[in-house]
């Protein structure tokens, strides 16, 4: 009987301070000559100054320093675009995805569908997959914008297992597909020994056994180091397996801290270059109409054809200083949310605007909001062609009273389009269009338009009249 130990992380999302603690544990307990050390994706989150300023390269340097064998490509690795991804794949470290391609289905330079590693005489095939959301227009919108194509992974995994038969003894799927997809693959694919999962942030105290395949996943945010131990007989059949998630209580790893410091210095130097200087600071409030949010709403409306702009204040975290840099904009708008054009009814718009005057919405918080970076939901900002009488609950668009039965084209975020926070806005897929730009990208492109600073002084929310 042989023991094969797979140590793993997933969905670290740039929580590198906690990752440093995990690496201290790895240095003590992982036998790099015998064990396997894998990450199941979403390690590099663009909210990080280091990741943003090094185009993800800083994250790869951390994985290399920690002794990782490979990483599956998660959505946060490719959402920043092809240029960023190819910089990461050019760092002499295995980034795996068998189902991520260019839009024309050609391979992406440096992306590997699988690798085979030999430890203690055992040949282990490691296949990677990225998240697959389906083929509908709304499902493919983000990858289309990135110039990429995701294919359904199940048949691809089966094909690789059959194609490589005889070249490996044990097979691992390193999956950023989420627990639901992992279970589907385990049910369907023959000859797969185990799945190390990610994407769904699932905390699995024990490994799950489906159709001869063992599945394990370790939550998120570097809270745990996962450990999956396989018992293998002389014919390389997995006889049993055990999984655990280890809470690490160690000191930070000095080597990781040094790499972080070096890469962060590179990032800050790149991001701190002054782009331009505004005539004034743009103040921010989570509760009240403010210059920063008025400017943002106006530039949204002016840039994307729509009847109005509507966005929650929680999309920003602070005001915008006169000296505009990429670093400042990342701090102001760390969210990876995209500009999104939707069609909402007048009633949906009115209900959301009126709800946004209530504290239970303004100060709402929730850990389940995917991609949401603000600490609170915030009130709602609108473009200057919208006039709201808060006392009389009258809303006008271009001077005409809002018609609750009419459909309006609105530029907003994919966060609000999903009905996150302001639940009355959810469910709109009719004529929905996603823009490639993040909100900080739009700010960078348009903040030097002084007419927007002027229009931002137009009051939209009126009381006492």
Model-derived regions, located:
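A short, polar/proline- and glycine-enriched secondary-structure boundary/capping micro-motif
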Residues: 135-139, 227, 250-258, 320-321, ...
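Acidic, metal/ion-coordinating pockets
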Residues: 1-247, 289-299, 309
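Charge-rich, low-complexity terminal tails
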Residues: 194, 218, 225-226, 299-305, ...
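Structural signal for hydrophobic packing residues in well-ordered secondary-structure cores
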Residues: 26-30, 89, 161-168, 179, ...
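Feature captures C-terminal
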Residues: 15-18, 320-465
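Glycine- and acidic
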Residues: 8-10, 280-283, 337-338, 424-425
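A short C-terminal boundary segment appended to hydrolase-like catalytic domains
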Residues: 233-324, 447-465
């Amino acid at each position: 009987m042989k023991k094969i130990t797979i140590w793993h992380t997933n969905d670290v999302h740039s929580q590198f301070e906690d990752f440093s603690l995990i690496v201290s544990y790895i240095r003590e307990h992982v036998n790099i000559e015998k064990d396997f050390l894998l990450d199941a994706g979403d390690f590099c989150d663009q909210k990080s100054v280091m990741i943003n300023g090094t185009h993800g390269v800083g994250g790869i340097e951390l994985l290399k320093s920690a002794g990782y064998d490979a990483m599956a490509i998660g959505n946060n690795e490719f959402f920043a675009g092809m240029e960023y991804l190819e910089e990461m794949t050019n760092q002499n470290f295995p980034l795996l995805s068998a189902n991520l391609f260019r839009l024309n289905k050609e391979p992406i330079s440096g992306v590997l569908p699988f690798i085979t590693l030999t430890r203690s005489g055992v040949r282990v095939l490691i296949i990677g997959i990225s998240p697959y959301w389906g083929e509908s227009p709304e499902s493919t919108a983000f990858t289309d914008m990135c110039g990429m194509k995701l294919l359904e992974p199940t048949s691809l995994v089966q094909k690789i297992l059959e194609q490589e038969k005889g070249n490996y003894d044990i097979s691992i799927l390193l999956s950023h597909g989420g627990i639901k997809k992992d279970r589907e693959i385990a049910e369907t694919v023959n000859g797969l020994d185990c799945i190390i999962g990610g994407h769904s942030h699932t905390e699995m105290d024990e490994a799950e056994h489906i159709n001869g395949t063992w599945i394990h996943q370790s939550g998120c945010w570097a809270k745990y180091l996962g450990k999956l131990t396989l018992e293998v007989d002389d014919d390389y059949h997995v006889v049993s397996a055990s999984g655990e998630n280890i809470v690490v209580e160690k000191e930070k790893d000095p080597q990781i801290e040094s790499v972080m410091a070096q890469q962060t210095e590179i990032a800050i130097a790149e991001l701190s270059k002054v782009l331009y200087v505004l005539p004034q600071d743009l103040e921010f409030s989570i509760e009240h109409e403010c210059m920063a949010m008025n400017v943002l709403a106006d530039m949204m409306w002016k840039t994307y054809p729509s009847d109005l702009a509507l966005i929650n204040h929680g999309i920003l975290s602070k005001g915008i200083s006169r000296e505009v840099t990429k670093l400042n904009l990342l701090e102001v708008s760390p969210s990876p949310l995209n500009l999104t054009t939707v069609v909402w009814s007048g009633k949906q718009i009115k209900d959301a605007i009126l709800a946004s005057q209530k504290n239970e919405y303004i100060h709402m918080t929730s850990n389940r909001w995917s991609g949401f970076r603000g600490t609170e939901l915030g009130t709602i900002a609108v473009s200057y062609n919208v006039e709201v009488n808060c006392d009389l609950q009258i809303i006008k668009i271009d001077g005409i009273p809002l018609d609750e039965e009419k459909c309006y084209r609105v530029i907003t975020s994919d966060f609000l389009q999903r009905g996150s926070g302001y639940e009355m806005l959810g469910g709109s897929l009719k004529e929905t269009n996603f823009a490639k730009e993040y909100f900080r990208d739009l700010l960078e492109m348009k903040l030097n338009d002084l007419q927007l600073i002027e229009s931002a002084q137009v009051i939209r929310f009126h009381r006492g009249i």
